Amino acid sequence: IRRPPRSTLDRSSAASDVYKRQMLENRETMLQMFPELFTKNRVQPIQNYPQELLYSLKNTLPDTAENKSNVCLLTPGPYNSAYFEHAFLADQMGIELVQGNDLKVVDGFLAMRTTQGHQKVDVVYKRLDDEFLDPLNFNEKSGLGVPGLFDVYRKGRVTIANAPGTGIADDKAMYSFMPEIVEFYSGESPLLQNVPTWRCAIKDQLNYVLDNIHKLVIKQVHGSGGYGMMIGPTATKKDIANFRRKLIATPQDYIAQPTLSLSTVPIFTNKGFAPRHV
């Protein structure tokens, strides 16, 4: 969130459920504290988000689905930092929260272990990275996924959301092409504008970034969660020199963007209210 409305990145593979829970709880708190604000400004409700998400998931049922469809949320487990949010969202949607060892391929279909035996699963809402999804097809050391799951998926017998491979749009270099992609496929200009982005793989743009590195935010194209980036105006001389070497050695691994004035929200600290960036 920032002013004016622009996007700084796309998360299309497994965006954190932490933000979804915070969104719902924040709205509930705000409704209790400032009900007139929402009534006066006709703010759209979001409390039905979990059910809307479930509705969307059920709309992706495979052709093999029967009248009584089964949707589950696949979590890495209780040691994952977002496990509480996974449990919260599964509970709100009224679906089963499962780990990899709760699922099994039976007779060419994905099944969930229950007290009544195996039950066929039609849709898996995955909350783990693709590489851990199936040790037979991806990372063989993964103990979080389901052996053979991807084979069932390729045969069209189960839906995985978001689909494996959609994480390509998380790539920050891909982000810089999004306006052109939107126009190519829709014939329309995007409603939400991108932040200006320099692709360091292009020599002229790399030269600009190197000349202005102290003013820009440098991001690793495959990085996430604040890793692999440098904020020029607050960086030390050592950090700037380090990133300059990285840009020269592997320019294709980086993009650059201007620093932004992010939106803030008031929070309560031990010294009273203070603004914090969203």
Where are these regions (language model features)?
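Single conserved hydrophobic/aromatic residue that forms the stacking wall/gate
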Residues: 1-15, 19
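Domain-scale recognition of functional cores that engage charged ligands
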Residues: 17-278
